[in-house]
Amino acid sequence: MGGPWMGSVGAGWGVSYIMFYGIIGTGAIGGYYGAKLARAGKDVHFLLHSDYEQVAANGLQVDSVAGSFTLPAVNAYRRAADMPPCDVVFVGLKTVNQHLLPTLLPPLLKPDTLVVLIQNGVGVEAAVQQMFPHVQLAAGLAFICVAKNRPGVVEHLDKGSIDIGNYSCRDAARMAHLMADLADAGIEAREVEYHEARWRKAVWNMPFNGLSVALRATTDALLADEASHGLVRALMLEVIGAARALGVEALTPELADRMIAYTLAMKPYSPSMKLDFDYHRPMEIEFLYTRPIALARQAGFDMPRLSMLEAQLRFEEGRTLKTP
């Protein structure tokens, strides 16, 4: 419920210090991680849009393969201006809505706030750092199958871990406290080198998001067919090659086979870009394709297959995007 906030916040970074968490973009991913933290007793504040009334009145429900639960009352807000300053802010907005951050983020900021961008793509933090030069940023790379198809209800289908990559956080204690809180909430979380974290997720995202739209297929269908299975692997190797050209040597060609095995073990899933396409919403082409392809090209590495897929996605978006 929105309104005044309370909490016993200690003066130091000891055990008694209770961090305030803000969730900007309480969709499927932000809703899931925020709800898990709130269930563990953390002080979490949710910015909502279309389902504010539902959540403010009835709380937040998580239907999960790992155990469903309901939070009957949460700190729900319709306006960022009504939210308290937070120690950690999770941004779960789609990157097509980055232009909203200069309005949404400032009310939640303190001088030492850590902003974790749980968003798809490469180059996300650099773009946000230009908007907020002095804000501490980290990348949040969620490996999870989750959807939000009903107001106030998050459907958790599979997986659920998150990698955190430090982009510009100067406060080691803040980062350590975040990792401890995630663990306390039952969230499998690792702190990973920033560039490795972003490009590792891109190895999965760039093939599956785009191909799910271009071929109108879920993850299981893409891997069940010999031709599309081979294409998925070829695209993964192209992403790995780009990452290595940019100095991310921790990503090796063997990662493609591990990612495919990981996906085969998942429940059939429509990636977020496919859902955006189905609902005639803007797709996250810029940060998922355009920017990483441009970065690779600057390093002397071309991504011809993914450049073609990017062009197909631009064409599809132009045809299907709803007009005002």
Report each predicted region and the residues it spans:
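NAD(P)-dependent Rossmann-like dehydrogenase/reductase catalytic/cofactor-binding core
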Residues: 16, 183, 233-324
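Rossmann-like NAD(P)(H) cofactor-binding subdomain of soluble oxidoreductases
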Residues: 68-153
